[in-house]
From Swiss-Prot:
GO cellular component: ribonucleoprotein complex; ribosome
Family matches, as Pfam families: Ribosomal_L9_C, Ribosomal_L9_N
GO MF: rRNA binding; structural constituent of ribosome
Record's keyword terms, sorted: Ribonucleoprotein, Ribosomal protein, RNA-binding, rRNA-binding
One record GO biological process: translation
Role played: Binds to the 23S rRNA.
Protein family (similarity comment): Belongs to the bacterial ribosomal protein bL9 family.
NCBIfam families in UniProt: L9 (TIGR00158)
Name of this protein: Large ribosomal subunit protein bL9
Coiled-coil segments on the chain, per record: none
PANTHER family reported in the protein's UniProt record: 50S RIBOSOMAL PROTEIN L9 (PTHR21368)
C-alpha cells in the first residue's frame, strides 16, 4: 500500500513523502491517526494544494515543542510513594504518575510523551527520564521518587 505522509513519522519519512507500507499498518494506524492518506490521484492533488498549510502547521508544532523543551530542561519533579524497607515501592511509579507530577509543576505533558525504557520505577531514588515532545524534540527531566511520610 502506498501512502502520502501528512506529518513526520519516525522511521518512515517526512511530510509529503510517498512511502510503501504494509496494508494493515496503513489502514489501521497511519490513516486513522491522520498521519497519512492513501496515495490516490485525488489525494495527491489534495495534498499538493494543502502542502504549504501542512508545512506551516508542522513548523508551528516544532516551535511549540521547542518552547516546551525550554520550560522542561532542568526541571526536577518529586513524587512521593509508599515504600517498604530498602526503598522498595509498594506498587510502582509509571508514565501516568510522572506526567501528572510534571503537569502539576506547571508544564502540560501527556502520558504518551513520557519514555521509560526500563519500565516503571519500583525503587526510591533519582531518575533521568526522557520526554518525547515531538519526533525531533526530546527533553530530559529529573524525577526524584521518595518514600511517603506516614
Amino acid at each position: 500500500m502506498e501512502v502520502i505522509l501528512l506529518e513526520k513519522v519516525a522511521n518512515l519519512g517526512d511530510l509529503g513523502d510517498r512511502v510503501k507500507v504494509r496494508p494493515g499498518y496503513g489502514r489501521n494506524y497511519l490513516v486513522p491517526q491522520g498521519k497519512a492518506k492513501p496515495a490516490t490521484k485525488e489525494n495527491i492533488r489534495y495534498f499538493e494544494e494543502r502542502r504549504a498549510e501542512l508545512e506551516r502547521q508542522a513548523q508551528e508544532a516544532l516551535a511549540a515543542a521547542e518552547a516546551r523543551k525550554e520550560q522542561l530542561e532542568g526541571l526536577t519533579v518529586t513524587i512521593s510513594a509508599k515504600s517498604g524497607e530498602e526503598g522498595k515501592l509498594f506498587g510502582s511509579v509509571g508514565t501516568q504518575d510522572v506526567a501528572d507530577a510534571i503537569t502539576a509543576a506547571g508544564v502540560e505533558v501527556a502520558r504518551r510523551e513520557v519514555r521509560m525504557p526500563e519500565g516503571p520505577i519500583r525503587v526510591t531514588g533519582e531518575y533521568e527520564l526522557e520526554l518525547g515532545l515531538h519526533t525531533d524534540v526530546t527533553a530530559l527531566v529529573k524525577v526524584v521518587v521518595q518514600s511517603q511520610e506516614a
